[in-house]
Amino acid sequence: MESLKNNDERIENFLNELKNLQSNIDKDIKEFSNSPNTSNAEKDGKFLSKHDEELYNKQIIRLTQEDRISNLSSLINSNIEDSFLLAYQTILNNLPGVGPVFQMIFGIMGNGIDLEKFYKEIIAQVEKMIKKSLEDYFKNQCNIIFNNLGKACDQHKELTQKWYDNHGIRSMNHLGEEIPQSSSTIESDETLTPMIHASYLDLKMKFNDALTYFTDSKYRGHVAPLLTYTSVMYFAFLRDILKYGKEMKFDNSIIDGTANTPGIKKISNDFVNKSLSEFLKSGVEYTKVVNSLQEGEWQTYPPPIGRVWVPPVPIEWVSPPATSLALKFFLANTDNYPKGGKVVKVTNGYYELSPIKMTYALEVYYSSGHGYSVNYYPSYRFGGKPILPLIAPVVNTLFTMLNPNRFSRTFKIRITHKIVREAKWNLDFFDNEVGEAGSFNQKFVFTSTTSHINPICDKSETAGVTEIPGPFTTDKKYIRLTCIRKFNLQEPKNEGYAYGSSIFSVELIDL
C-alpha cells in the first residue's frame, strides 16, 4: 500500500498532462478555425508579411503539439513503479473513451503485468489518438484551402474568359476543345483589367497557402496529387499572364521583375523547379497514395528496378476536391502547341494537357539531359485519368499500362518525342507483373518530326510525332512498351533511345 500511496502524485500528474495536452490541442484547433480571413486584406506591403506570419504560426502550433507528446512520453517513462492496479483504475475513471483500449491491453497481459510495458502501451495509444486528431485537422485544412483555391480559380477563369471574348481570342478547355464565347454582357477593358489584376493577387496568395500545406514533409505522401494539381494550375495562370500580360495592362515589373522583386518569368521557373524537386524527394512517399487513384482506368505504373511492383495500401481521403478544380485552368490560346497535346516548357520541366480519349490527361516530365529513370516513379490520376509524373528515358525504358478491371480495349498508339537516334520498341500484353508469356509483340521506330515554338521562351524546338495505328485489342491486365537499345552512350552508331532524347507523351487512344 505504501508503494501505491507513493505513486498517487505521479499518476495524478500523468493524467493532468494528458488532459492539458488534449485541452491545448482543442484550443489551438478552435483558434485556427476562427482565425481571420485575409483574402480581403489591403494589397499593400504589409499584406503578405501578415499572411505569411499566420501560416508560420500554424506550423509552429503543430510542432508544439508534437513537442508536448514527446514530453509526455518522457514523463511516463521516468515515473514507472509497481502500482499497476491503482494506475489502471485511475485511468479508466479519468480518461473516458480510452478505457476500452486499456481494457484490451489488460486482457492481453493478464495478471502478470509489466508496469513499464503497460505504461508504454498507454502512451503509444494516446500518441496515436492525438496524431490522428492532428492529421484529421491537417486534412480538413487542406480541403478548405483547396476549396478556397477553387473559388479563386473560378473567378479568375470567368474574368479572363470575358477578356478573351472581348479580344476574339480562342481559349481551350481541359480536353483541348474550344470554349464557346461567353453569353455574358461584354465589359470594357477598363473594367476588366483591374479585376484581373486583383484576381491574380488573390490567386497568388491562395496558391502560397496551398504550397505551405501541400509540401509539408510529414504529409507530402498524402497530398501528392493535390500538390500536382496546385502546381499545374498555378503555372497555367502564370502562363496566361506571360502570354497576354501586356495586353491585359500588367506592369512590366510584374512580368519581368525588378532588382528586388522577382517577376512572373522567374516565379514560373522557380515554382516549377521547386515543385519538381518535391516530386524527386518524395517518389517513395507517393507510392502510398497510388492505389486510391487506380480504380477502373488505364494507368501507367513503372515497376521499381530489380523487383516486382506491388500496389500499395489504399489511402482513403486523397483528392476529391482536386478533380473538379483540375478542369478549370487552361485558358490560353493553344495554336502554337504541337499536335497530340498542349506542351509548355519551363527550363527543364514539361507540363502537358492531352486531348480527349487519351490514356492520361496530364503529364509532368523532368529531364536535365542526364535524365531520371522512369522506373522509380508512380502515376496519379487526373480528372478520372492517370498522370505520369516523370519521364526521361536514358536507360532502357519500360512503360507498363495497367487495365485493372481487364476490360477489352481497342486502341492505337501515338508517341510525341524528341529523338537523337531512332529507337526500336516492343509492345506486348500480359496478365502478371513480371510480364511472362506476352501474348503479342510488335516492333516499330520513330519517324516524323515537326517544329513548334516554345510559347514561354519563344525558342523553336523540334518534336516528332509517331503513330502506330494498330488497331490493338486486348483484355489483358498489363500492356508494356519497351525500348530496345544498346547501352553504350559513347558509340554514336548504336541504335536506341539515346542520351539527350525526350518523350513528351505516350498515348493509348481508344478507337
Swiss-Prot record:
One of its GO terms (molecular function) is toxin activity. To D.discoideum protein M3R. InterPro entries: Pest_crys_N_sf (IPR036716). Keywords: cAMP. The lineage of its organism: Eukaryota, Amoebozoa, Evosea, Eumycetozoa, Dictyostelia. Induction: Stimulation by changing levels of cAMP via the cell surface cAMP receptor. This is cAMP-regulated M3L protein. SUPFAM superfamilies: delta-Endotoxin (insectocide), N-terminal domain. It comes from the Eukaryota.
